[in-house]
C-alpha cells in the first residue's frame, strides 16, 4: 500500500504558535484534514483550552489515538524560526516536530491511505493542554466520552517514546508522580542566643532525612525502584547570624505500581509529623502509576513496529508522565512515537524519513486492528 505523505500536514501544524494554552489555529488545521477523511468533529472547550474529538465509523473494535497540539515555549537561539517549519538537510525543524505534531500528522497520513469504510470505530482525542497543567485537556475529554458511552476500547498515544532509533521503545506504563511542599515554623533569633529562638531547620532536616533514607521498594518486573528526590530547601534567610523564622522544602516521588498517591501522601505526612510536629504539608498528586500488561494489544503494536523497522521494540515504563495516565483509568493504553532526543530543545527537529516511517507503522497498526 502506498502511504500518504505526512510532511505537508506536519508543516501546517508546526506553523501554528500553539504554546499552551494558545491554539493559534492548529486544531482547525487538523480538523480540516480529518473532515476531508470523513470524520465527524466535536469541539470541547474548557476554560482557555481547545480540545477536539474526531470520530469515524461505529461499533467494535473502537480504536483511539490520543495526542496534543500544544507545545512548550521555543526559547531562543534557533537556526530557523521555530514556527516556520523549515526543511533542511532532510530534517523538519519546528517546536512540536517531535512532541508531538509530527506524530499526529503521521497518524492522519496513515488514515488517508486506507479505506474510510472500515469496520468499527476510530477516534482521535486531541488536546491543547498536555504541556501545561493538564487540567482542561485529556482528562476532561475522557470524562465527556465516558458520560456519553463513547470511550475507545484501547488507545495509542503518539508521544515520542523512542530513545535512539525509531522503533526501539514502546511505553506500556508510566510511574506516578507526587510532590510535597513542607513548611516548618519556628522563632527567629540571634545565633548567639539559641535559647531565645526556635530553629525550624533542626526539625525539618531530620524529617527530610527520614523520608530520604526510607527504601520505598526494590522495583517490580516492569518498573524501576520508586525514587524520592529533595529538590529545594529554603529559609529566605540571607544573614549568617540569624536563626530563621521558618524553613521549607520541596520533594518529589516518582513511584511504581506498588504504591498509590494517597498512600504515599499519608506516609509523607506521618513521617514529617513524627519529626516536625505542626509542620504544614502541601501535597499534590499529578498522576498514578499504571501498567498495560503485555498481551494482545502490545503484541499488535510491536509486530507493526517490527514489520517496518526490523526492530523488536523494548516494552518500557521509564521517563516522565504523559496523558496516558488519564487514559489508563478507562482502557488499555500504550505509547509509541518518534525519537525524543530533540523534544523541548532548541532546534527541535525530526528526520523527514522517520516521519514517513512512523506513518507506515501507524498504518500497519490500523491494518492489524481492522483486518
UniProtKB/Swiss-Prot annotation:
Task: Give the catalytic activity.
Answer: N-succinyl-(2S,6S)-2,6-diaminopimelate + H2O = (2S,6S)-2,6-diaminopimelate + succinate
Q: Which residues bind Zn(2+) 2?
A: 99, 131, 344
Q: How is the cofactor bound?
A: Binds 2 Zn(2+) or Co(2+) ions per subunit.
Known cofactor(s): Zn(2+); Co(2+)
EC number(s)?
A: 3.5.1.18
Q: Which Pfam families match?
A: M20_dimer, Peptidase_M20
Q: What is its pathway?
A: Amino-acid biosynthesis; L-lysine biosynthesis via DAP pathway; LL-2,6-diaminopimelate from (S)-tetrahydrodipicolinate (succinylase route): step 3/3
- InterPro entries of this UniProt entry? ArgE/DapE_CS, Bact_exopeptidase_dim_dom, DapE_proteobac, Peptidase_M20, Peptidase_M20_dimer, Peptidase_M20A
Q: Which residues form the active site?
A: 70, 130
Residues reported in the UniProt entry to bind Zn(2+) 1: 68, 99, 159
Q: Does the keyword Cytoplasm apply?
A: no
GO molecular function terms noted in the UniProt entry: acetylornithine deacetylase activity; cobalt ion binding; succinyl-diaminopimelate desuccinylase activity; zinc ion binding
Q: Which GO terms describe its biological process?
A: diaminopimelate biosynthetic process; L-arginine biosynthetic process; lysine biosynthetic process via diaminopimelate
Q: Which UniProt keywords apply?
A: Amino-acid biosynthesis, Cobalt, Diaminopimelate biosynthesis, Hydrolase, Lysine biosynthesis, Metal-binding, Zinc
UniProt-listed HAMAP family: DapE (MF_01690)
Q: How does it assemble?
A: Homodimer.
| Family to which the UniProt record says this protein belongs | Belongs to the peptidase M20A family. DapE subfamily.
- Function, as annotated: Catalyzes the hydrolysis of N-succinyl-L,L-diaminopimelic acid (SDAP), forming succinate and LL-2,6-diaminopimelate (DAP), an intermediate involved in the bacterial biosynthesis of lysine and meso-diaminopimelic acid, an essential component of bacterial cell walls.
| Name of this chain's protein | Succinyl-diaminopimelate desuccinylase
What species was this sequence derived from? Acidiphilium cryptum (strain JF-5)
